[in-house]
Regions:
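Short glycine-enriched, charge-decorated loop/helix-capping segments at active-site entrances
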Residues: 47-52, 88-89, 167-168, 233-238
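Glycine-rich, proline-tolerant flexible connector loops at the mouths of alpha/beta enzymes
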Residues: 40-62, 118-122
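Histidine-acidic metal/acid-base catalytic patches
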Residues: 1-11, 18-35, 59, 66, ...
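Active-site acidic/histidine proton-transfer and metal-coordination neighborhood
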Residues: 24, 63-68, 82-193, 200-203, ...
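N-terminal small/glycine-rich loop or linker at the start of catalytic domains
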Residues: 2-13, 72-83, 117-118
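Metal-dependent catalytic neighborhoods of phosphoester/phosphodiester hydrolases
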Residues: 48-55, 85-89, 123-124, 268-269
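Active-site-proximal loop/turn and secondary-structure-junction residues that shape catalytic pockets
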Residues: 16-18, 41-43, 78-81, 115-119, ...
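Conserved beta-strand positions in the central sheet of alpha/beta enzyme cores
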Residues: 38, 74-76, 112, 150, ...
Length: 292
């Protein structure tokens, strides 16, 4: 490794651990040598904290970090700010604000939120306004608590009979709508850049909208998708044709990039394949290197 190389720190995302008890997240992360681990609140997943974690649950979670020597500053919250019903939207905002407070109590510095999952073309002016207002309210709370929001680049998903998924452009994967978001959102609000999620709706853009988002990325997930049957199936970076080398070489974000391997049946193998791929990039690149 030369002195000129950009050293990128790699952590591990929580979604591939969603069916495992929380302690096993830490055990697996420790096994690989990760120092950074994402966690989630709500969503009715075995591998997440409850919808409204009490102090005992929070203390138990924080104790795991201390026990395993792993930092957990990244928290995922399940939300949709594009709901058509105004009352349901208001309830969603209240839920998210409560969970942001729980994330802060857990020691998080960043919360990963979603804009919403309806097709971008179905977002009316009214829905757009409510969505922006929701992020403004959540950002104000985050500023008080010392947290930052990273909005995930994530399309709408339809599940096919063959087990694959069809991805539909949302406001966070469509370039024109992303440009509007960059203009309308509070300036503190950033993006969880997930190139794989952008690839599946914009397969011809080999840099996955990096040119548009580069200055606002404050969170990053690493995965790929492969065509299968009627749609796509998630995989490890390096499993398919998404070339991460030029993305890493041009990425301005200097925080933790998290491997997010989604399949449940071979979680550890998928993480290892991802690390092996990063090793190949490091060998090929004069610009980037990786560390855990």
């Amino acid at each position: 490794m030369t002195e000129t190389k950009k050293n990128i720190t790699i952590g591990v995302g929580e979604w591939g651990f969603r069916a495992l008890p929380m302690r096993e997240h830490f055990q697996i992360a420790k096994k690989f040598g990760f120092q950074w681990l994402e966690f989630g609140i709500g969503g009715d997943q075995v591998g997440r904290l409850s919808e409204a974690p009490d102090q005992a649950e929070i203390d138990e979670f924080k104790a795991l970090g201390t026990e395993y020597g792993i930092k957990t500053p990244f928290c995922c919250i399940e939300n949709d700010f594009t709901l058509a019903d105004a009352d349901e939207h208001a309830a969603m905002v209240d839920k998210v604000k409560s969970q942001i407070q729980a994330a802060a109590a857990c020691g998080a510095t960043h919360v990963r939120l979603f804009a919403g999952f309806i097709p971008a073309g179905n977002v009316t002016g009214e829905i757009w306004g409510r969505m922006i207002d929701a992020f403004a309210k959540c950002d104000a709370l985050c500023e008080e608590l010392g947290l930052w929001i990273g909005i995930e680049t994530h399309g709408g998903i339809e599940f096919n009979d063959d087990g694959s998924t069809t991805h539909i452009n949302s406001v966070t994967t469509d370039a024109a709508y992303l440009q509007r978001l960059l203009t309308d959102l509070p300036p503190r609000v950033g993006f969880n850049y997930d190139p794989g999620n952008i690839k599946v709706v914009n397969p011809d853009d080999k840099l996955c909208l990096l040119d548009l988002l580069n200055d606002r990325i404050n969170y990053c997930h690493l995965k790929d998708w492969s065509r299968c049957g009627q749609g796509w199936v998630a995989g490890a970076i390096g499993d398919d044709d998404l070339d991460y080398q030029p993305i890493f070489e041009q990425l301005k974000f200097d925080g933790i990039c998290q491997i997010e391997y989604e399949p449940l049946e071979d979680t550890e193998d998928g993480i290892q394949r991802s690390l092996d791929y990063l090793g190949r990039i490091e060998q090929a690149s004069d610009i980037v290197a990786f560390k855990l």
